[in-house]
Amino acid sequence: MTWSYPVDPYWMVALKALLVVVGLLTAFAFMTLIERRLLARFQVRMGPNRVGPFGLLQPLADAIKSIFKEDIVVAQADRFLFVLAPLISVVFALLAFGLIPFGPPGSFFGYQPWVINLDLGILYLFAVSELAVYGIFLSGWASGSKYSLLGSLRSSASLISYELGLGLALLAPVLLVGSLNLNDIVNWQKEHGWLFLYAFPAFLVYLIASMAEAARTPFDLPEAEQELVGGYHTEYSSIKWALFQMAEYIHFITASALIPTLFLGGWTMPVLEVPYLWMFLKIAFFLFFFIWIRATWFRLRYDQLLRFGWGFLFPLALLWFLVTALVVALDLPRTYLLYLSALSFLVLLGAVLYTPKPARKGGGA
């Protein structure tokens, strides 16, 4: 089935693009505060609460501090690439969010609740996410520091291990819907049910790979403080360092919006059609989920991430892609996928609950 969508005038597209940029920058500022407060609650402490009422002006204080700190360019750095790298990271982080639909057509004051609508939207998102790593790689190369270079090389190598699984996981909804358009994927879910019910393994792979792509714990290897001092941005300070943090948080927010769009119905819900509210709640849930993971999980070693990407994410995504392709090619009932997806969930649940814990070494009390 194909759906048609009205096209907005250019001035409205430009206005919505501006709103997205301003909204993401504001969300970045306050997500730093929210994450610090939540991590503090997980760790039984207070968190930042001194600047302004309830600490709400802490992001402003952080911004002022970052802007007015000394901006150092180390002597051995390639100055042009050193300055260019954080800009590349931020630009490509911002480019993905404009495709995400937040409501049905015409629900934004008579206009469309997205910036642009591309028939090749999934390919566009995949390309933008791939290009974003150039900022990290250039920062490591241009810094002239072995720690920065190792951090950027880690990011480039790990990218290959999880991006293959992520790409194959995206093909499951594409095969079922028959479209690369994000709006088509949301509308299909409105009529047939959420895609994670038909493709739980693909949903799981995409969720994990999204954490790796956003460099969130337990996959924040490119900036492992214990091993690489500060990772690829070791030599950065002031506003340039803040730009890298901005890019990381925007990836974090974008991933939290893409997961419900692709697998959890986007702005749709079986009850109470309040699209913007449901989309906001779904995004907020995954933001909290990622912060929860950061508070409770340890960081994987570099070799563990590569083994996990090649040994679990890629085979699982490939297997589910082949299963979905077989069902679609033979025109079998889609209920087969529902049963297989439920079975895979039960297998995962059983593995989590009944896997024996390794015995402790040593004889300490």
From Swiss-Prot:
EC primary class: translocase
InterPro entries named in the record: NADH_UbQ_OxRdtase_su1/FPO, NADH_UbQ_OxRdtase_su1_CS
Entry keyword set: Cell inner membrane, Cell membrane, Membrane, NAD, Quinone, Translocase, Transmembrane, Transmembrane helix
Its membrane topology: Multi-pass membrane protein
EC number assigned by the record: 7.1.1.-
GO biological process, any: aerobic respiration
Location in the cell: Cell inner membrane
Catalytic activity: a quinone + NADH + 5 H(+)(in) = a quinol + NAD(+) + 4 H(+)(out)
A single MF term (Gene Ontology): NADH dehydrogenase activity
Coiled coil residues, start to end: none
Source organism superkingdom: Bacteria
GO cellular component entries: plasma membrane
Predominant location category: membrane
Bilayer-spanning residue ranges: 11-31, 80-100, 120-140, 157-177, 192-212, 252-272, 273-293, 310-330, 336-356
Pfam families: NADHdh
Quaternary structure (record): NDH-1 is composed of 15 different subunits, Nqo1 to Nqo15. The complex has a L-shaped structure, with the hydrophobic arm (subunits Nqo7, Nqo8 and Nqo10 to Nqo14) embedded in the membrane and the hydrophilic peripheral arm (subunits Nqo1 to Nqo6, Nqo9 and Nqo15) protruding into the bacterial cytoplasm. The hydrophilic domain contains all the redox centers.
Family to which this protein belongs: Belongs to the complex I subunit 1 family.
Known role: NDH-1 shuttles electrons from NADH, via FMN and iron-sulfur (Fe-S) centers, to quinones in the respiratory chain. The immediate electron acceptor for the enzyme in this species is menaquinone. Couples the redox reaction to proton translocation (for every two electrons transferred, four hydrogen ions are translocated across the cytoplasmic membrane), and thus conserves the redox energy in a proton gradient required for the synthesis of ATP.
Stated name of the protein: NADH-quinone oxidoreductase subunit 8
Name of the gene: nqo8
